[in-house]
Amino acid sequence: MRNISYFCIVKRIIRFFYTTFVALLMLFNSEASASPLPDISLSEISDSALASVEISLLTCKPHEEVYSLYGHTAIRILDTEGGRDMVVNWGVFDSSQPNFVYHFVLGETDYMMAMVSTERFLRDYYYYGSEVVQQKLNMTTQEKRKILAILDEYSKPENKIYRYNFYYDNCTTRARDVIVEAMDGKVEYPAWKNQKGDETFRDIIHAKNSGYPWCEWGNDFLLGMGSDANMTPSERQFIPEMLEKDFDSACVVERDGTRKPLVEATSILLPAGQSMADPMAGFPLSPMACAVLLLMVVVALTLCEKYVTRKEIKWLDYLLFDVLGLLGLLLVVMMFSEHPTVRVNLQIFLFCPLWLVLYSPFFRWKHREKAALGILALFFLGNIFQCYASGMNVLALSLLIRIMKNLKKSNE
């Protein structure tokens, strides 16, 4: 087990793939704690001892490391008299599994539920200076027994492993579902009444990536049309801090109609501190700045080609189109991924693998520029249906300039 602790030209390409892999890591993972305790039965806690048992929702806030931007959620079980203090965590995976990276990219990573000591769970968050908020749940003895039975069932070898899904089945949604199932009444969220319902998955991702423009760009490069769909209030709860906020005002409507708050008390289990880790060294230019800079270079070289050297700069087309085509192979792979909202991604018309054929030094076709223009037109049209990553339209203008120049020359 491990803790998800999540341009010379060749160098820049390597940096790009590094950025997109980090984006995958941070986008499709939440932080996790390792070193699970030996399998134990929560049923060992007697009914008489349940009075001293406290069940809490733990929300671990983001810290400065990129992989933590979405936070983490777990359930704490504290026996104040028996001394047992553990955390139930659905964020554990085994990176030593065969072909782990292959399965990870395709969204076929299996996560598992594990129980760790609270001290061990908090250690990493203390190191990074991350705040951990505890919401003690307002549960009856019967509800405590029920949630322990549910957790006991999940801890069985045949049940503890699950297929992780960032939006719909992650460490936060699992904790929420267990808690809601254990309550004898219906859990209602008054906070939902104030929500307009016009927030998309991409909006949430952007909010969590604030201050990290290249992470935001990497996520937007990978995310397709599905991420621009409006979320329901419950779907927003895939983010730990969203669930924490909803739980703050949530209430349980019992069978007799009486209402009680879901959360009995909220406290800071681990205060935010000074991180002992080095801050992430970001690239000095934003994605938009890089796209504008590239556009200026393309315009300058195209003008130089026409008015100064009067010779074709063929290497510019090969470099520009073929690099984008190579990067587009990643989007092709994502078409077969189980990760949510990545299969239909209209940015593939910009990062188009067909560029590798159309703009190969060994390929000659008189209709090449017309075909390229058609592909690029589909990309621009896609703005209606999908929110593109920062700088993508500017990058497309660089291609359009080269296509129109070549098209004009071929018609002369």
Residue ranges and their predicted role:
Residues 51-130:
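Glycine-rich catalytic cores of cysteine/serine-nucleophile enzymes that process amide/ester linkages
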Residues 153-367, 377-412:
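Activation targets extended, charge/polar-rich intrinsically disordered C-terminal tails
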Residues 63-64, 130-138, 157-166:
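Second-shell loop/turn segments in exported
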Residues 18-29:
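Bacterial N-terminal signal peptides
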Residues 6-9, 20:
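Short, positively charged and aromatic/hydrophobic N-terminal segments
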Residues 142-151:
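Short, charged, amphipathic alpha-helices and their helix-cap/turn boundaries
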Residues 32-36:
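Boundary at the C-terminal end of the N-terminal hydrophobic targeting segment
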